[in-house]
C-alpha cells in the first residue's frame, strides 16, 4: 500500500513530466498552414457559464421559476422563457456579453502560437444585430472586433451573422473548425474535422470527424500531433 509520501512523490513527478512534455512539443514546427475557423460563444468564451450566471439572476429578479435544463443550447430553452421574456433578457444583457465576458483560459495565447506558425485564424460567429437598436443598430461587428482586440486575440478575418456555418466553411475554404453548438458541429463535420468544445448541450454528438476538446492547450496539442 502506498503511503502519503509515495503519493506526493508520484504526483510531483507526474506534474514535472507533464510540463516538460508541453515545453518539448512547443518546439515542434508545423509544416502545413491551415485556415482555422474559430467560433466565439462557447469557444473563445464560456457562454454556458455566462448563460447560467446571468440567466438565474434575470429569472430571480423577474420572478421566473420554470426549472433549468443545462442540456439545451438556447437561453429560452434552458430557462423556459417566453419570447417576450427572452427578448427582455437580451436587451438587458447583450452589452455584458459583447463587452465584459472573459475569454477562456489561454485562448489568446494558443491562437497567437498558431498564428505565429503561419495558420490563418478566421473568426466565424453567428452573432447578429437583432437586439441592437437606436444608436447601437448594426454595431455588432464593431463590438466583436473591439472585444477580440481588447483580449489580444489574433485573427485574419471576421465573418459574423446568421446563416449556415457549413456553407460559410465551404465559401471561405476552411480546413478545420472549432465549434460548440451541436447542430453546427454535426453539419460541419460532414465536410471538415471539427474540434468540439465540450459542453452539456453537445454531449450527444459522437461522429468520426468530431474531436472533443476541453481546453485551449488541448487544441494546441491536437495541431502539434497532426502537423506533417
Predicted regions and their residues:
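Short, basic/glycine-rich phosphate-binding loops at helix/coil junctions
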Residues: 78-94, 121
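Active-site neighborhood of HAD-like aspartate-dependent phosphohydrolases
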Residues: 6, 13-85
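Substrate-recognition element of Asp-dependent hydrolases with the DxDx(T/V) motif
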Residues: 98, 107-144
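Membrane-proximal envelope and lipid/glycan-remodeling enzymes
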Residues: 13, 17-24, 126-129, 133, ...
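C-terminal cap/substrate-recognition subdomain and adjoining C-terminal extension
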Residues: 119, 134-176, 181-228
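Short hydrophobic segments within beta-strands
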Residues: 39, 124-126, 178, 197
Amino acid at each position: 500500500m502506498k503511503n502519503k509520501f509515495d503519493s506526493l512523490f508520484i504526483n510531483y513527478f507526474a506534474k514535472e513530466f507533464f510540463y516538460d512534455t508541453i515545453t518539448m512539443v512547443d518546439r515542434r514546427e508545423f509544416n502545413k498552414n491551415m485556415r482555422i475557423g474559430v467560433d466565439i460563444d462557447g469557444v473563445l468564451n464560456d457562454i454556458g457559464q455566462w448563460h447560467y450566471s446571468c440567466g438565474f439572476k434575470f429569472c430571480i429578479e423577474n420572478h421566473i421559476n420554470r426549472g433549468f435544463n443545462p442540456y439545451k443550447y438556447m437561453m429560452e430553452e434552458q430557462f423556459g422563457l417566453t419570447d417576450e421574456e427572452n427578448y427582455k433578457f437580451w436587451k438587458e444583457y447583450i452589452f455584458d456579453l459583447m463587452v465584459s465576458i472573459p475569454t477562456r483560459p489561454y485562448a489568446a495565447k494558443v491562437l497567437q502560437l498558431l498564428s505565429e506558425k503561419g495558420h490563418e485564424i478566421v473568426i466565424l460567429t453567428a452573432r447578429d444585430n437583432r437586439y441592437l437598436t437606436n444608436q447601437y443598430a448594426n454595431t455588432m461587428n464593431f463590438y466583436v472586433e473591439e472585444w477580440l482586440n481588447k483580449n489580444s486575440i489574433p485573427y485574419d478575418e471576421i465573418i459574423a451573422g446568421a446563416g449556415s456555418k457549413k456553407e460559410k466553411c465551404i465559401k471561405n475554404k476552411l480546413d478545420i473548425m472549432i465549434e460548440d453548438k451541436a447542430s453546427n458541429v454535426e453539419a460541419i463535420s460532414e465536410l471538415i474535422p471539427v474540434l468540439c468544445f465540450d459542453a452539456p448541450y453537445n454531449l450527444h454528438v459522437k461522429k468520426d470527424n468530431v474531436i472533443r476538446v476541453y481546453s485551449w492547450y488541448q487544441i494546441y496539442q491536437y495541431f502539434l500531433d497532426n502537423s506533417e
